[in-house]
Amino acid sequence: MMTGLIWFVQVVHYPLFARIPEEGFTAYERSHANRTGWVVAPIMLVELAAAMLPLALKLPLAPGRTAGTDPLYLSAVGCLLLIWASTFLLQVPLHRILERRHDKQAILLLTATNWIRTLLWSLRLAMLAMLFTECAFA
């Protein structure tokens, strides 16, 4: 779910920030951040819980494979942790700047650094698809 959303944000949403007039931009950004949070936060929390639960419970993925020892599963979890780190260390601070003022450099950085999440979520989706395929036919 987040992979499709992040591609929309990367290709359509963030680039359009540059077209929002300076007048009214901060009000727009505050509203944007608030509304986006209500949509994205629950999905990200469920995704994180769904990734961590199999680790905590040491669930088997397939014969001889557990979530805690499977390199592909652990790599997918690693992608998710990097996504969270990028979100809170890069994108959230940039949104905070934009809530205070229209800043062309911050908009460019937001769009550029969001590629980190876009690529990681895409890689994670590919890993989970491979894992599902491997485990389904094991």
Placement of each model-derived feature along the sequence:
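Juxtamembrane boundary at the C-terminal end of a transmembrane helix
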Residues: 128-138
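Internal alpha-helical transmembrane segments of multi-pass membrane proteins, especially GPCRs
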Residues: 34, 38-41, 74-77, 111-118
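Hydrophobic residues within membrane-embedded alpha-helical segments of Major Facilitator Superfamily
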Residues: 1, 50, 72, 79-82, ...
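Interfacial loop at the N-terminal end of multi-pass membrane proteins
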Residues: 1-46, 96-109
